[in-house]
Amino acid sequence: MKIGQIRQSLSGFYDVYADGQMYRTRARGNFRKRRITPLVGDNVEFDAATPQEGYVLNILDRQTQLVRPPVANVDLGIVVTATTEQEFSTNLLDRQLVALAVAGIEPLLYFAKTDLLTDEVYQQRLTLADAYRQIGYQVICERTAFSPAALAAVKTALAGHVAVVMGQTGAGKSTLLNHLQPGLALATGEISQALNRGKHTTRKVSLIPIADGLVADTPGFSSYEVFDIAANELTHYFPEFVRLSVDCKYRGCVHINEPQCAVKQALAAGELLASRYDNYLQFYETIKNKKVIYNKKK
């Protein structure tokens, strides 16, 4: 019996990487009865008589699990954010950060298309990047697009990790991957095609070795449209709120209508990003409204 990592799934086959070699395997027969589905990124125990014929016997404990894309053990989310005025959205950025936090995945923010900005707008983005760094996020915001310094920072963050790349269509995800690993044009082109097809995405899921890490070559982490959490849990996924909440008068304060709220006091004092608080309020209302719909199902 061997231990390896599933690097690709396609049509019921799982390609498992172990000891420098790839093995083509299937899931053992009782997986379907037990409703167990191996995922790309799973660490597994398997037997293989030859590299072309083997069986996955057991799936080791998963650290994280995503639905879209269906990948296990992702521990880094590279958030590619287009910074041009017509594309930039702190709302989308904060949605992505909350979704990653809920999934237990560390974010890396990459501000793209900075070379298209005027100096004035770039300074605004730089100020915002510094504000996110103060919250505790790692942010890359170089003046020159895909500069050696920016790419080196991504490579350092990626080394030894399993990552998904997320961001709106056209943000620069494919271009970033091409710069990190020249020669990936075909694979990243497939990402773009899948994104443009909307729901009709490829059913093949793979992990591509890039910069001493692994990147899922799927349309990306896209399950951030709806948060599957309770509204009163949302505050736990805003790190700056968590730090301040110890000084709120009421335990369980959600920082909206409560008196003597440390978060609202910090906001009034200009110590919090107003956009972050505004987005928090919108997400809170969205979750409250969605929960009613969920409870009516079935």
UniProtKB/Swiss-Prot annotation:
Binds 1 zinc ion per subunit. Zn(2+) binds at C248, C253, H255, C261. Its EC number is 3.6.1.-. GO terms for cellular component: cytoplasm. The keyword Nucleotide-binding applies. InterPro entries: G_CP_dom, NA-bd_OB-fold, P-loop_NTPase, Ribosome_biogen_GTPase_RsgA, RsgA_GTPase_dom, RsgA_N. It is found in: Cytoplasm. One of its GO terms (molecular function) is metal ion binding. GTP binds at A112, K113, T114, D115, G167, Q168, T169, G170, A171, G172, K173, S174, T175. Its main location: cytoplasm. Its cofactor is Zn(2+). Coiled coil: none annotated. Residues 63-224 form the CP-type G domain. The keyword Transport does not apply. It holds the Pfam family RsgA_GTPase. One of its GO terms (biological process) is ribosomal small subunit biogenesis. Keywords: Cytoplasm, GTP-binding, Hydrolase, Metal-binding, Nucleotide-binding, Ribosome biogenesis, RNA-binding, rRNA-binding, Zinc. Monomer. Associates with 30S ribosomal subunit, binds 16S rRNA. One of several proteins that assist in the late maturation steps of the functional core of the 30S ribosomal subunit. Helps release RbfA from mature subunits. May play a role in the assembly of ribosomal proteins into the subunit. Circularly permuted GTPase that catalyzes slow GTP hydrolysis, GTPase activity is stimulated by the 30S ribosomal subunit. Belongs to the TRAFAC class YlqF/YawG GTPase family. RsgA subfamily. This is Small ribosomal subunit biogenesis GTPase RsgA 1. It comes from Lactiplantibacillus plantarum (strain ATCC BAA-793 / NCIMB 8826 / WCFS1) (Lactobacillus plantarum).
